[in-house]
Amino acid sequence: MSRKYDTCRNMKPLRGQERAIKSPVMRYLNIVALGAVVGLAAGQPAEASSSAWYNSEGGKVRLVTSGKPDEAGKIHGVLDIALKPGWKTYWRDPGDAGVPPQIDISASTNIADAKLSFPPPQRHDDGYGKWAGYDRPVSLPVTFTLSAPDQPATIDANVFLGICETICIPVQTRLSLDPASDPNNATDAALVKTALATLPGPARSDFGIRVLPGDHETLIVEAHSPGDAESVDFFIAGERDYMFGAPVRSEKDGKLVFTVPILDRPSATPTDGGLYYTLTSAEGAVDGLLPFP
């Protein structure tokens, strides 16, 4: 494929998401540009606890919720991405190429925050680049936090994601719903419950990582996992102006080590929070935060 256009470098992120999709998800993408597909899901006034489907070239997308908020003032839902065969979408940090899913809820009523969570990704090399994500339909859990838990809420979300085959289509659409309008929908609740069950568990001593001494340009971690070490993979999300290359695995003295090039980093190392990682194996997956290198 010729490198005619670099659509991802020219796409505008959702408002408030500029940091989230800085260079880590916009590099090296060889695609034929169809342009961003922008629109509203058909027939989707905020009258249902789930939105209508929005149809695109490579699949369709909708928001589904389990209805009313829980005691903590949170509404649980999923960004439901139904991919056509041969199409793919991306993890929170796609790798060499791609656009991660994003959601902007600034137009919503009584919604303070929306947090996307990600099932364990797979690593792929399709001949155009190495990427982390999903090559089959996937439901990404979303947790909506209410500003005032005792007040009604409506969700009016701008969703932005990449759906790719041999071409990449940036999809941006508005999905609206009223979580309280159908709070006892068993089908929606089951979909949300199933999606939550796919998430990685918390890292633990026998299934997780230990950060080893590295340098300004290299992150090194030792991975611990039950079962076959050959199946283990390590994914790290470049955020806060960090950008990482593909991890290189090595085994020595019975220890599994991943060495990750740091391609870009902030001028000052952040002191709050950390970087998301996921460790996968044939036995399952765990995730956590590691200190900023």
Tell where the protein language model's regions lie, with residue ranges.
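Positively charged n-region of N-terminal signal peptides that target proteins for export
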Residues: 2-3, 12, 23-29
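Short, linear, compositionally biased motifs with a strong N-terminal bias
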Residues: 18-20, 38
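Bacterial N-terminal signal peptides
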Residues: 30-41
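Extracellular/lumen-exposed scaffold segments
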Residues: 47-293
